Amino acid sequence: MATVGGAFKDSLTQAQKDELHQIALKIVQDGKGILAADESTGTIGKRLDAINLENNETNRQKYRQLLFTTPNLNQHISGVILYEETFHQSTDKGEKFTDLLIKQGIVPGIKLDLGVVPLAGTIGEGTTQGLDKLAERAAAFKKGGCGFAKWRCVLNIGTHTPSHLGMLENANVLARYASICQANGLVPIVEPEVLCDGEHDLARAQKVTEQVLAFVYKALADHHVYLEGTLLKPNMVTPGQSSASKASHEAIGLATVTALRRGVPAAVPGITFLSGGQSELDATANLNAINSVQLGKPWKLTFSYGRALQASVLKAWGGKDENIAAAQKTLLHRSKANGDASLGKYAGEDAAGAAAESLFVAKHSY
């Protein structure tokens, strides 16, 4: 293979590239997606509070154990994003969660960003912190069994947002994170989330998403990120939560695929959508619609869902040991539905019950 020298000399060896590419491909294998279980202590506390359960380490461990010990989870889940606390936790039998997942053929991942902070010089926009000592942290998580990482940046649609500065800064932060991850053997999941808060229509959501993706992939190129060893975790293109105009699943699918075709290089192995506060059923139906669009789609299109996989699971569990099997059955059902949707083979289901409830949270943070 030809080598590149000078200012464009590769910082990664071929062996490093091969490993990153293989991990990315494993995560986006047909019919599978990611379970995002990386909620911060505060966020998971809100979920536990909804079922009248105290937010303490014991209950958080018990809930994550319920998720990760679900029988046959690996039939539909290829990766799990962990929060740092969860990364260090074990089952009641003393087996580390990371080892439990690896044994099932599921790739453990880690949330590396440290949350959104205000971006000076903008009107209400933010950037994401956590770059300090990131290389050390990434190396430690790789040594501990993780194969990938996630970093979330947030942009909102308003009269004057997202601004040029907001898009540029967040794209560069994502690119710095991605290059550091790859140097330490972790596949970076790049997450530029355009929030669904607002009154904007589908067309504006599509335009903003296209612009954000353009900034992101320019920054990734500037930072010499190896695209074949990355994954993208974007929002679907939907009207704003307060928009007067609604959109069908088919319209959302077409707008989303169109935006991706205009902004995401074919070298990227896969796109793992966030659910963005959609109901469980909408998140699944929209993923199915995206995969059913009759346009060229060079990437795998699958899911990286948190709320849209867990909301009805939490309700089924209710914090009671006698409900664990029922809750795990619910998780397996939702995972299979989304796995089918990632293939464009979701047949739909009854729109009654918890799965149909909106999971929208204004200005949502993890």
From Swiss-Prot:
- The active site is formed by 191, 233
Q: Which organism is it from?
A: Caenorhabditis elegans
**Which family is this protein grouped under?**
Belongs to the class I fructose-bisphosphate aldolase family.
Gene3D superfamilies xref list: Aldolase class I
PANTHER family in the cross-refs: FRUCTOSE-BISPHOSPHATE ALDOLASE
Q: Which GO terms describe its molecular function?
A: fructose-bisphosphate aldolase activity
User: What domain of life does the UniProt record list for this protein's source?
Assistant: Eukaryota
This protein's name: Fructose-bisphosphate aldolase 2
Q: Which InterPro entries match?
A: Aldolase_I_AS, Aldolase_TIM, FBA_I
**Which BP terms does GO give this entry?**
fructose 1,6-bisphosphate metabolic process; glycolytic process
Please give an example of a GO cellular component term from this record.
cytoplasm
Which Enzyme Commission numbers does its entry carry?
4.1.2.13
Q: Does the keyword Lyase apply?
A: yes
Alphabetical keyword list:
Glycolysis, Lyase, Schiff base
What is this protein's gene name? aldo-2
Catalytic activity reads:
beta-D-fructose 1,6-bisphosphate = D-glyceraldehyde 3-phosphate + dihydroxyacetone phosphate
Source taxonomy: Eukaryota, Metazoa, Ecdysozoa, Nematoda, Chromadorea
Q: State if Lyase is listed as a keyword.
A: yes
Q: Where does substrate bind?
A: 60, 150
UniProt pathway: Carbohydrate degradation; glycolysis; D-glyceraldehyde 3-phosphate and glycerone phosphate from D-glucose: step 4/4
Q: What positions are marked as the site Necessary for preference for fructose 1,6-bisphosphate over fructose 1-phosphate?
A: 366
